[in-house]
């Protein structure tokens, strides 16, 4: 038969083995959890890296689009200003030409009136001469 001390040692030994098995199981579970966590963290880091890269690409495209829009706006306003300046020049040229033609027309109207007056005077003079000649022949 076994003594109490031997029985205690046996229970102690069994208890130590159970604790050892529990610890091994806990350690194995912890390793699996750590591996799963490491994989999840690695996956999240990769996903974050892709998203950061995509955001940087999109920010670059946005900046490029804004620059193009600014360049187009500057170009559009420059072209519009040039068109307005050209229209003003054309209008000024047309005003000068209109003033010249009006002055020329005024001069021609004056000459026409002078000619009309001369013709009337000539007609009246012919009538007078005609009466005068007729009076002399009768």
Swiss-Prot record:
Low complexity: compositionally biased ranges: 12-23
Keywords associated with the record: Coiled coil, Cytoplasm, Cytoskeleton, Meiosis, Sporulation
InterPro entries according to UniProt: RAB3IL/RAB3IP/Sec2 (IPR040351), Sec2_N (IPR009449)
Alphabetized GO MF terms: guanyl-nucleotide exchange factor activity
Sequence intervals crossing the membrane: none
Localization terms from the record: Cytoplasm, Cytoskeleton, Microtubule organizing center, Spindle pole body
GO cellular component: cytoplasm; meiotic spindle pole body
Residue ranges, compositional bias (Polar residues): 1-11
Coiled coil spans: 16-104
Up-regulation conditions: Induced during meiosis by the transcription factor mei4. Protein levels rapidly increase during meiosis and then decline.
Chief location bin: cytoplasm
Gene3D superfamilies per the UniProt record, alphabetical: 6.10.140.910
Pfam families documented for this protein: Sec2p (PF06428)
Residue ranges, annotated region (Disordered): 1-31
GO BP term, example: ascospore-type prospore-specific spindle pole body remodeling
Lineage top rank: taxon: Eukaryota
Quaternary organization: Interacts with spo2.
Protein task: Involved in sporulation. Plays a significant role in modification of the spindle pole body prior to spore formation and is required for initiating forespore membrane formation.
Name the UniProt record assigns to this protein: Sporulation-specific protein 13
Gene, per the UniProt record: spo13
């Amino acid at each position: 038969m076994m003594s109490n001390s031997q029985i205690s040692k046996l229970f102690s030994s069994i208890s130590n083995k159970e604790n050892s098995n529990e610890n091994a199981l806990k350690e194995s579970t912890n390793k699996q959890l750590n591996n799963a966590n490491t994989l999840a963290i690695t996956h999240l880091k990769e996903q974050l890296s892709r998203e950061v890269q995509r955001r940087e690409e999109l920010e670059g495209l946005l900046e490029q689009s804004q620059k193009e829009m600014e360049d187009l706006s500057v170009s559009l306003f420059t072209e519009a200003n040039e068109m307005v300046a050209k229209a003003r020049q054309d209008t000024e040229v047309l005003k000068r030409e209109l003033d010249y033609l009006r002055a020329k027309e005024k001069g021609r109207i004056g000459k026409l009136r002078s000619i009309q007056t001369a013709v009337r005077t000539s007609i009246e003079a012919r009538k007078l001469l005609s009466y005068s000649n007729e009076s002399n022949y009768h």
